[in-house]
């Protein structure tokens, strides 16, 4: 539920994905 300051509209979460973030509603979120 916490925004990870990375979008995933065109490409998946990259750097923030390593921190455990995942794509939701075009934005990378962590819980």
UniProtKB/Swiss-Prot annotation:
It holds the Pfam family Cyclotide. PROSITE patterns: CYCLOTIDE, CYCLOTIDE_BRACELET. Keywords: Disulfide bond, Knottin, Plant defense. GO terms for biological process: defense response. It comes from the Eukaryota. There is a cross-link at residues 1-31 (Cyclopeptide (Gly-Asn)). The presence of a 'disulfide through disulfide knot' structurally defines this protein as a knottin. This is Cyclotide cter-D. It comes from Clitoria ternatea.
